[in-house]
Amino acid sequence: MKDYIRRVSDGEDLTQAEAREAASLVFEEATEAQIGALLSALRAKGETEPEIAGFAEGMRAAARRIDPDRSPLVDTCGTGGDGHDTINVSTTSSFVVAGAGVPVAKHGNYSVSSSSGSADVLEEIGVTIDAEPPAVETCIEETGMGFMLAPVFHPAMKAVIGPRKELGMRTIFNVLGPLTNPADADAQVVGVYDEALVPTLADALSRMSVDRALVVHGAGLDEIGVHGESTVAEVDGESVEQYTVTPSDLGVDSHDLSAVAGGSPTENAADMRGILEGDVEGAKRDIILANAGAAIYIAGEADSLAAGVDAARESIDTGAAAAQLASLREFEP
């Protein structure tokens, strides 16, 4: 670990394999001072794509992993930290995706930077959020969807809580959550808080085991937005293509950003229920359609983003999305 700290402090980039080993040392034997020193040095130097991929692989290796017998598994998970308290877009979208027949292994946590994280809103709406890995695996196989709470599946992360808190700044771990799905999802939609991270995380994902992914940033949001142009990087194996999409490209209307504002977990749970049951129209429904459609597309279940949005719309309008919520609430670990 001392060698890695020295080299990174001197401005040297680590290889992906070295970054993976450094992550293992962080989780297994490094002191808090060493962890803080490495994270600070990486931040000062600037984390490279191979370093991000290597750390993500090391974090995955330390996780409690599951292997549900459903495919293609998809995850919708963002970095958070975009500074906008919107409704719970990726979480609500997950039910729409699963309702469309695409199995979902949702990875998430309690809120860090917003009023309501995925775990907060799911707990409020009556879903068991802290199930053990075998139970989540069964849940995905039986209902088509499961929620993996980060602290349950990533106990090794306890080692970095203290150093991260004391540093008080963003580190490489702020972008690793979406890259460390414990079910090794086949396809992902990854939202990022900074547009500059779109090509960075797309490149990192292309170096990992994910088959297909969309890395997205929507005019200030770590989601595909419905208030302007969104930047998208599409990962297919080792290839990456970057482009932009507008709401009209997806077949939804444009809205003001303020129209997708969220609130407390209670308020966001009410919005989630209303959207899934077809009682909420307008911007909040449209942003869910856009992001659910993206997940359906990248899972290979639609030929285009717009076709994915059509499938998402059908999931809500037929009652399938609401039924998916009911089945997850009723599942007993």
Swiss-Prot record:
Pfam families, alphabetized: Glycos_trans_3N, Glycos_transf_3
Entry EC number(s): 2.4.2.18
Binding-site residues for Mg(2+) 1, renumbered to this chain: S90, E223
Enzyme class: transferase
Obligatory cofactor(s): Mg(2+)
Superkingdom in the source lineage: Archaea
Positions bound to anthranilate 1: G78, N109
Residues noted as binding anthranilate 2 in the record, renumbered to the chain: R164
Cofactor note: Binds 2 magnesium ions per monomer.
GO molecular function terms attached to this record: anthranilate phosphoribosyltransferase activity; magnesium ion binding
GO biological process: L-tryptophan biosynthetic process
Entry GO CC: cytosol
Membrane spanning stretches: none
Catalyzed reactions per annotation: N-(5-phospho-beta-D-ribosyl)anthranilate + diphosphate = 5-phospho-alpha-D-ribose 1-diphosphate + anthranilate
Pathway annotation: Amino-acid biosynthesis; L-tryptophan biosynthesis; L-tryptophan from chorismate: step 2/5
UniProt xrefs under InterPro entries: Anthranilate_Pribosyl_Tfrase, Glycosyl_Trfase_fam3, Glycosyl_Trfase_fam3_N_dom, Glycosyl_Trfase_fam3_N_dom_sf, Nuc_phospho_transferase
Binding site for Mg(2+) 2: D222, E223
Family: Belongs to the anthranilate phosphoribosyltransferase family.
PANTHER family xrefs: ANTHRANILATE PHOSPHORIBOSYLTRANSFERASE
Function, as annotated: Catalyzes the transfer of the phosphoribosyl group of 5-phosphorylribose-1-pyrophosphate (PRPP) to anthranilate to yield N-(5'-phosphoribosyl)-anthranilate (PRA).
Subunit structure: Homodimer.
Protein name from the UniProt record: Anthranilate phosphoribosyltransferase
Source species: Natronomonas pharaonis (strain ATCC 35678 / DSM 2160 / CIP 103997 / JCM 8858 / NBRC 14720 / NCIMB 2260 / Gabara) (Halobacterium pharaonis)
Gene: trpD
